[in-house]
């Protein structure tokens, strides 16, 4: 897409800076790194000539006193109207803050996401992940509430996209993949790279973190096989009741699955060891780095998908043997996940209006009823 190249995010690492933009058509072009102090004033004689690689990323050297950065291309340096500088996000640590985190695939489309997000996050929390990187393409206010709550807890952060396009979809997925890759770099040791409808199932010894700790130091990615779970209905748009919630949970509702296959594999990645991603797996690793395939007995990914010939890869059933089998999560994991999802849903979405009985008498007697945003219990 030949869209405007806007600044998305910028990260300072131990040895350099990475600036991510919103357009891939600048790939390979020359770019100028520009540095600004805490007052957003450009630092004199600090500019640096670089190039866009990979995709929409510009690498720049660090500069003393730089708190904000921007980039310019070609003759843009002489134009007064340029890209406003954005703040540098610190990624300089003695060791990664998180051992295992999740890069959540982009959230877009018309289908409601609030319950899917909760199922996703609570599933991966049970697997031992401690942080989530969200990317918000298009999201309504109701769905956004759960993202805000996870950010409130300090277990998530989100990247917001502001482009000239009314809506973003799968064609911007690669930008999300790389932005999250650079966002997690040096912040997390291992990163699960999965879409919102994908759940890693670990069936190996001990737990997932223990398994990753056993990896040789030169392993930059562990790849997992996948199977598809047939999804036949849209997600609920809003919370109705606890009984309805149990009927809507995807991991209870959908259990017709294909065989496990290496078609459309997914990966857990060491960000600082991988230079370039292709959607959910590494495409280019640094010298000496190896990719390992996890045996099927260790784990696989359950991918919940409906069949829609008009959607991207909507005819996915053609890539499997066509036989669907009933499979479920382990009973102990299911019970824990039900409890976690129920607790989070009720905390965020089980809401009511203010009751007039709750308002202190000194306040209710001072103001007229029509000014009080309340109803009596039995109204």
Predicted regions located by residue number:
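Active-site-proximal beta-strand/loop segments in catalytic clefts of secreted hydrolases
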Residues: 105-107, 135-137, 161-163, 194-196, ...
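Active-site-proximal specificity loops/subdomain of glycosyltransferases
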Residues: 49-52, 90-101, 107-109, 113, ...
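Catalytic-site signature of metal-activated, phosphate-bearing donor transferases
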Residues: 1-87, 92, 170-178, 202-379
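Short, surface-exposed basic-aromatic patches at helix termini and helix-loop junctions that form
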Residues: 125, 146-155, 209-216
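Aromatic/hydrophobic pocket-lining residues that form the small-molecule binding cavity
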Residues: 117
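Short, acidic, metal-binding catalytic loop of nucleotide-sugar glycosyltransferases
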Residues: 120-130
């Amino acid at each position: 897409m030949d869209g405007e190249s806007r600044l998305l995010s910028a990260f300072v690492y131990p040895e350099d800076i990475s600036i991510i933009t919103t357009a891939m058509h600048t790939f390979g072009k020359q770019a100028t790194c520009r540095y600004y102090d805490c007052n957003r004033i450009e630092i004199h004689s600090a500019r640096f000539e670089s190039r866009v690689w990979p995709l929409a990323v510009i690498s720049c050297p660090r500069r003393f006193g730089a708190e904000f950065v921007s980039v310019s291309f070609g003759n843009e340096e002489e134009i007064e109207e340029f890209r406003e500088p954005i703040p540098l996000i610190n990624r300089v640590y003695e060791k990664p803050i998180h051992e295992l985190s999740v890069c959540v695939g982009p959230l877009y489309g018309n289908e409601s996401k609030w319950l899917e997000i909760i199922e996703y996050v609570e599933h991966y929390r049970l697997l031992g992940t401690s942080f989530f990187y969200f990317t918000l393409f298009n999201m309504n206010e109701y769905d956004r509430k759960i993202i805000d709550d996870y950010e409130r807890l300090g277990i998530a952060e989100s990247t917001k996209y502001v482009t000239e396009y009314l809506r973003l979809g799968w064609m911007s997925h690669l930008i999300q993949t790389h932005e999250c890759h650079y966002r997690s770099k040096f912040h997390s040791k291992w990163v699960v790279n999965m879409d919102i409808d994908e759940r890693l199932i670990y069936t190996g010894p001990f737990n997932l973190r223990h398994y990753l700790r056993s990896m040789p130091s030169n392993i930059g990615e562990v790849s997992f096989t996948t199977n598809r779970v047939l999804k036949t209905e849209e997600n609920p748009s809003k919370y109705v009741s606890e009984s309805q919630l149990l009927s809507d949970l995807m991991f209870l509702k959908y259990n017709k699955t294909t065989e496990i296959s290496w078609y459309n594999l997914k990966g857990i990645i060491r960000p600082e060891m991988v230079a370039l991603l292709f959607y959910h797996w590494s495409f280019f690793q640094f010298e000496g780095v190896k990719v390992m395939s996890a045996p099927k007995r260790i784990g696989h990914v359950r991918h919940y998908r409906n069949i829609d010939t008009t959607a991207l890869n909507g005819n996915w059933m053609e890539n499997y043997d066509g036989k669907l089998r009933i499979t479920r999560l382990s009973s102990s994991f299911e019970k824990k996940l039900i409890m976690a999802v129920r607790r989070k849903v009720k905390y965020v979405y089980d809401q009511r209006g203010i009751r007039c009985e709750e308002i202190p008498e000194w306040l209710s007697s001072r103001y007229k009823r029509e000014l009080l945003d309340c109803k009596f219990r039995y109204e």
